[in-house]
């Protein structure tokens, strides 16, 4: 079996709407160390689900996306110690994640068992002083604002860039968040 065909852990993310993704990914490309920036901007919901769950994960993501997108907003600039992120607030997205966590409860890693702090990483694996400087710079102009969540996706993780496994887009009407 080739490395590309070998079973790989599944990562689950929320997908941003086009304009929000372009903006967040532009920040990430501008500030993430280029030699480590293998991924576009994303919101991770689960870091490591067993590869054997792919069919069930795909079915559940499609079912969850049959309704409207969860309201969400960018709440603040977060300092991660050696990086910077944008904190995402969305009780509805957290409820979707909790539904998935309940379904896969016995199969979650300790990291995925914990309640996540939803965020979009802009910079990571830099010196703490560089992270603090970027956080200060981003906070100067940052204002909380709505964030469009367009869908959910599953990815294969094989140690490098993630490989898409499936994508499901929300089909219901969008609800604005103040």
Residue spans of the language-model regions?
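Basic, often amphipathic N-terminal segments
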Residues: 1-71, 91-151, 161-178
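Charge-rich, low-complexity N-terminal segments
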Residues: 82-87
């Amino acid at each position: 079996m080739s490395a590309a065909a070998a079973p790989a852990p599944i990562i689950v993310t929320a997908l941003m709407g086009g304009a929000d993704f372009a903006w967040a990914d532009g920040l990430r490309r501008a500030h993430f160390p280029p030699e480590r920036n293998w991924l576009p901007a994303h919101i991770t919901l689960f870091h490591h689900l067993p590869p054997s769950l792919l069919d069930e994960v795909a079915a559940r993501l499609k079912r969850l996306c049959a309704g409207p997108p969860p309201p969400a907003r960018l709440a603040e600039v977060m300092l991660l110690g050696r990086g910077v992120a944008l904190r995402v607030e969305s009780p509805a997205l957290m409820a979707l994640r909790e539904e998935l966590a309940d379904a896969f409860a016995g199969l979650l890693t300790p990291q995925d068992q914990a309640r996540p702090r939803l965020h979009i990483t802009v910079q990571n694996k830099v010196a703490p002083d560089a992270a603090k400087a970027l956080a200060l710079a981003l906070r100067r102009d940052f204002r909380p604002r709505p964030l469009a969540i367009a869908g959910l996706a599953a990815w294969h993780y094989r140690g490098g860039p993630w490989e898409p496994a499936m994508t499901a887009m929300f089909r219901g009407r969008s609800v604005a968040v103040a």
